[in-house]
């Protein structure tokens, strides 16, 4: 089956208007069930804390409960791993942050310089650098490293209250356990609920796009398609381009039908797809492909692919580290005591490696959300909210964070800012100082982040696209070599690698088109030729199955690949 016509021509991506970037809800999926679980995961054990007289420990509990957000949307087959891995990182973060806080505040309270706070800045920046690299190399979904850095920085302030790393670690682990229980609870009601929800969300997104064609609607539908395939693969329903669990084949059929509708609507509406930059969910998918996608390469392979100086993951990590440390150092020099706040602000703006204009829009969202969130905290501080009502506020914050974490930055930050300030013991400080210093720290981080987007390694995208294009050619050669000695079915690893390289090349040229349109114009025809040739190889393998390739076929395929090498 030919999945792309030989004269297929992909249009250059449209660039959304900044107002669209500012106001768009990036996902139409209903998130209230997961948000309710996140709130209850904090509320129920929080009530136990209150009953036992551990009111101040509810904030440490909340640090671990964030783990439930990382598992939402994942099939139950893999959800528990997401919760436990993120929970381990959150717990390690609060323990490390508390340990560093003891060193920092021990010296400062003994008359030492405020520059001891640079240890906190270094810790959160290191976490930001490593987390940003890993999440971009693996193309993980939101929320990424943001919550881990937020609780790590907040825990550095808990040392002033006399809590030890063991104390904060125990309470955070209790929160992780609660998150695991509530995160997996719906399994007993509908074991395949996440898969069904992902496919239904795709159908709804395509339907909404048909009713009202727009760039944002197209992106929501395309992101939903990528998510549906990812969830079906994680659930073990598809693998190797085939249906593995026939009893759930109706979900695959609905996904394919929705994909066909999306391509049809794109053609009839005239809406040209955009790059991934409307949201942080990496939509590594090509809607024009009819075959069931192959799995991504192994974790180690994806990490190794990104261990190059110009890779998206490396450049993004460098920008996060530079913006974070610069804004933190300036904040310390101005006498502010939360350098981690500046680092968190830089991370939330830069952690997914946004293009320039979307990145600036996120800076506006960060400023707006932070100002509103700080204002809410000021009101809570004024009314001296505590006990049951503090728990209620924390639960509402958890609910809102889960609802909006993949939808809109500004709204997410409104809900997370009061929680972060409470974790940092800001309730015991002068409210005027808190409002002023936190606002200025956010402003410093936004300015530093905008600067690195425009001026730190601006040519890296073009170099990385050349690197990825070369990887595509090498992957084609590897697949041809495998077909000489084995069947297409047994050449699955080489087919998987080629598909991944083609999708990565497509994603990188979308970014190149946004940031460097003149360079993208020069290589656009070559990009399309590479995509056509690569998918011609994959289509051939898909049609042959267990049948060995003939030498004549391989000769013809090799001739097409050589055209890329000779160009």
Kindly label every feature range from the protein language model.
Residues 97-114, 137-138, 383:
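Transmembrane alpha-helix boundary signature
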């Amino acid at each position: 089956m030919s999945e792309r016509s030989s004269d297929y021509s992909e249009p250059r991506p449209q660039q959304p208007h900044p107002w669209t970037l500012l106001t768009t809800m990036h996902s139409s999926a209903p998130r209230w069930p997961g948000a309710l679980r996140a709130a209850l995961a904090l509320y129920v054990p929080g009530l136990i804390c209150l009953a036992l007289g551990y009111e101040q420990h509810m904030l440490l509990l909340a640090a671990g409960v964030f783990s439930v957000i990382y598992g939402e949307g994942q099939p139950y087959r893999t959800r528990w791993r997401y919760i436990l891995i993120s929970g381990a990182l959150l717990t390690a973060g609060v323990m490390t942050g508390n340990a560093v806080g003891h060193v920092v505040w021990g010296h400062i309270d003994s008359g030492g310089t405020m520059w001891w706070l640079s240890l906190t800045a270094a810790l959160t920046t290191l976490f930001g650098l490593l987390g940003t690299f890993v999440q971009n190399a693996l193309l993980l979904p939101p929320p990424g490293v943001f919550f881990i850095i937020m609780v790590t920085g907040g825990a550095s302030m808990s040392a002033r209250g006399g809590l030890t790393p063991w104390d904060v670690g125990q309470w955070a682990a209790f929160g992780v356990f609660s998150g695991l229980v509530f995160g997996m609870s719906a399994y007993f009601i509908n074991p395949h609920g996440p898969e069904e929800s992902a496919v239904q969300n795709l159908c709804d997104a395509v339907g909404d796009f048909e009713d009202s064609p727009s760039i944002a609607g197209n992106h929501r539908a395309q992101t939903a398609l990528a998510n549906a395939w990812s969830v079906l693969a994680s659930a073990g329903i598809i693998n190797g381009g085939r249906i593995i669990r026939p009893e759930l084949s109706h979900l695959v059929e609905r996904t394919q039908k929705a994909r066909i509708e999306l391509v049809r609507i794109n053609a009839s509406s005239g809406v040209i797809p955009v790059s991934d930059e409307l949201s942080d969910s990496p939509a590594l998918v090509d809607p024009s492909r009819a075959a069931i996608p192959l799995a991504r390469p192994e974790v180690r392979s994806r990490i190794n692919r990104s261990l190059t100086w110009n890779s998206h993951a490396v450049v993004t990590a460098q920008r996060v580290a530079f913006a974070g440390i610069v804004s933190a150092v300036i904040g310390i020099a101005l006498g502010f005591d939360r350098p981690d706040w500046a680092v968190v602000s830089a991370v939330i703006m830069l952690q997914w490696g946004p293009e320039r204009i979307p990145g600036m829009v996120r800076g506006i969202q960060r400023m707006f959300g932070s100002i509103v969130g700080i204002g809410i905290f000021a009101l809570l501080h004024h009314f001296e909210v505590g006990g049951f009502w503090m728990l209620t506020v924390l639960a509402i914050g958890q609910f809102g964070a889960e609802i909006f974490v993949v939808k809109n930055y500004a709204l997410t930050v409104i809900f997370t800012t009061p929680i972060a300030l409470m974790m940092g013991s800001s309730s015991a400080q002068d409210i005027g100082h808190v409002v002023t210093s936190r606002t200025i720290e956010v402003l410093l981080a936004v300015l530093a982040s905008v600067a690195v987007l425009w001026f730190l390694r601006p040519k890296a995208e073009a170099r990385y696209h050349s690197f990825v294009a070369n990887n595509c050619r090498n992957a084609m050669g590897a697949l041809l070599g495998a077909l000489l000695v084995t069947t297409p079915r047994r050449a699955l690893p080489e087919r998987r690698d080629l598909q991944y390289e083609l999708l990565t090349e497509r994603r990188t040229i979308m970014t190149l088109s946004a940031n460097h349109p003149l360079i993208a114009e020069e290589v656009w025809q070559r990009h399309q030729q590479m995509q056509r040739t690569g998918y011609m190889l994959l289509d051939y393998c898909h049609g042959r199955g267990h049948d060995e390739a003939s030498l004549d076929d391989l000769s013809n395929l090799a001739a097409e690949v050589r055209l890329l090498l000779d160009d």
